[in-house]
Amino acid sequence: MKIICRLLLAMACLCLANISWATVCANSTGVTEDEHYDLSNIFNSTNNQPGQIVVLPEKSGWVGVSAICPPGTLVNYTYRSYVTNFIVQETIDNYKYMQLNDYLLGAMSLVDSVMDIKFPPQNYIRMGTDPNVSQNLPFGVMDSRLIFRLKVIRPFINMVEIPRQVMFTVYVTSTPYDPLVTPVYTISFGGRVEVPQNCELNAGQIVEFDFGDIGASLFSAAGPGNRPAGVMPQTKSIAVKCTNVAAQAYLTMRLEASAVSGQAMVSDNQDLGFIVADQNDTPITPNDLNSVIPFRLDAAAAANVTLRAWPISITGQKPTEGPFSALGYLRVDYQ
């Protein structure tokens, strides 16, 4: 019995030692701060080309973030982790390029507190020492000389809104085994990209398909995904006129929408939607970069693209009677 008691006591002491050793640090303000990159006004007719690498102005100073480690931290050094949800696509000159959206790859480098260049994403990087780490006092997260590189994989046409997104979430811990659960700061990007390459569709006017009155029971009789009996597709020819885009260029047209079900745009009546298709009635799946209508500009950098559309039942249920509509956006890209 005495041997068993001594073993249990030893195990308890070991567990307590591990709890004191392993600590997760936090932003000293209690709030996760953000280092943001604005991508507006970065691109022009020269660098808006496939394969071009654009280097944003260096953030040369310290990021200005302080962390604090909890009582019980036994060491004066920390580890930093730069975590991302993006997937690394390629590495060029040690920069790890991740696909940020349909148009761009992004990569970053930074210099840490021991004056060593790092190329995130990377976890549990050993940093320098600071006596405040073990004293439960704020200390600087000494990241500086941040360099953000962008690689164009698909040139922009017109204006593209890039919503604010987090590229890296930065964590500070006292061991390389602590969980990454409390962000200290983030590195984000976003902005409105406007380039000289411009294409105007339908002379800037809205393309409208009006199907008039359709009996509600016809939609339920048609079933999910089907067009009601007696309703014919409508056809529109969309005039495309481009500026600062080479004549005879190969382009594509695709569809963007906020509410989508399979290949259909969902209307403001959730039981109903619309299919938009090419001249052969092949649907264009909204928000799918690979679902496009290819076309070629003529010698005057112009073209006409045929669109067809028809209403369908989304759910197969009898819809509530009344007007219904959906709004989509046509986007032109380079092939």
Regions from the language model: what does each represent?
Residues 1-8:
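Bacterial N-terminal signal peptides that target proteins for export
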Residues 8-16:
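Bacterial N-terminal signal peptides
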Residues 21-335:
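Mature extracellular/passenger domains of Gram-negative fimbrial/pilin and adhesin proteins
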